[in-house]
Amino acid sequence: MTFRQHLVIAIGALVSAAALAPAASAQGGDCLTADPPSAEPGTINFGITPGIAGSAGVGQGTALPVINKAERQALERLEPRGRDLVLRLNRLFWDGGGKLIRKFANRVDRYARSGLKSEIQVRYHPPEGKEGNLRAWARFVRKAVRRLGRRPSVSAFSITNEINFPVSPNTSDGSYDRALEAMVRGVVAANRELRLLGRPNVELGFSVAWRFTPDADRNFWEDLGELATPRYRRALDYVGVQVYPGLVWPPVEIPGRTAGDEVAEALTLVRGCYMPKADLGDEVDLWVSENGYPTKPGVNSEAGQAERLVSSVNAVAAHAGDLGITDYRWFNLRDNDSDGADLFSQVGLLRDDYSPKPAFAEYRRAIRRLGDS
C-alpha cells in the first residue's frame, strides 16, 4: 500500500470520527479538534534541516548532491546577527552503523567551524536481522551519543522519528517492530551516555507525525504512558511535532483556515489531549521539530510558501507561553529536486541550484523578530 493510500485511510477514519462526535474537543478521547488557549507569546529557538530531505515511502527518491560551500554560504546568510540557528541533522540510521556515525561527526565539525550548533536525529531503521533487538539498538544509541555528544556544538538528540506513523519506513520508524519500546530504551540509553560525558544539559526528545488515525494516535500515547519508566520520564526534555498542513495533514487546505490555524490546533491537541494520555506534563517542552510547505505546481506557489511560513511561525510564537513551545525547525533548507514528484521534493527555502525563494528572506526576518538570542 502506498503512502497516499494510507493517507486516504487515515482521512476516512478522521472524517468518520468527526461525524460521530461533532462536538469533540481537546478533552475528548480521540482529540479531534480544539481551540487554542489564550495567546501568551514568547521567543523561539529557531533551526532548519540542511542536507537531503527523505522521500515518502520505502526508498529514497531523486535528490541533487549537496554542495557544501553553497550550503554554508546560505546558512550564514540565513542566521541574523545576535540570533542562533540550530541545524537539525536527520537520518542517522541504525543500519548505517559506525560508518554513518563518523560521517555525521564530520558534518557536525564542519558546521561548528561556521559557528553553527547541531542536533542529531538518531533513527531506529534497523539493520537486516536486527529489527526488534533492543539491546543491539541501545548499543548503537550509546555509540552515536558517545561519538557525537562529546562535541560542544551538539545541543540535542531526537531518538527515533515519527514512531506513531506506521507507513513510509524511509522517513518514519513506526513501520518497524517494537519501535515505541526502542524510543523509550533509546532515550534512557542516550541520557546515561550524556551523563557519563558530563553533558547532562544536552536535550533529549522524540518526534511524532501529525497525524495518523484517531484510534492509532490515541493508542500510541496510551501505550507510551504504560511503557514509560521513571528513568525515561526524568530523561525526556521535549516532544517534537512534525506538522505539514496541506501536505500530510490535512492533505488539502480547509477553506477559511490558515496554515497557522492548523499548526496551532495540532500543538494544542498534542499538549492538552495527547501528552496527558502518557502522563507527560509541563515539565516536557513542546517543539515543532519539522514544518514545511512545498512549492509544487498546482499545489502551492513560492509566494504561497512564504505566506504559510510566516503564518505558521507567528502562530508558534503567539502560543509559546501558553503551550510551552520552545523550538521551531523548518524542513528543509534546499529542494531535493525542484522538478521532482515526491511529496518533499520542493519544501526547501532554496531551489535545487541554491537560489533563494521568497520564503528564505521571510524566515530570516522571523528569526530576527521572534528568535531567542
Language-model regions: role of each:
Residues 9-19:
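Bacterial N-terminal signal peptides
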Residues 32, 36, 59-78, 163-164, ...:
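Aromatic-rich peripheral "rim/lid" segments of glycoside hydrolase catalytic domains that contact
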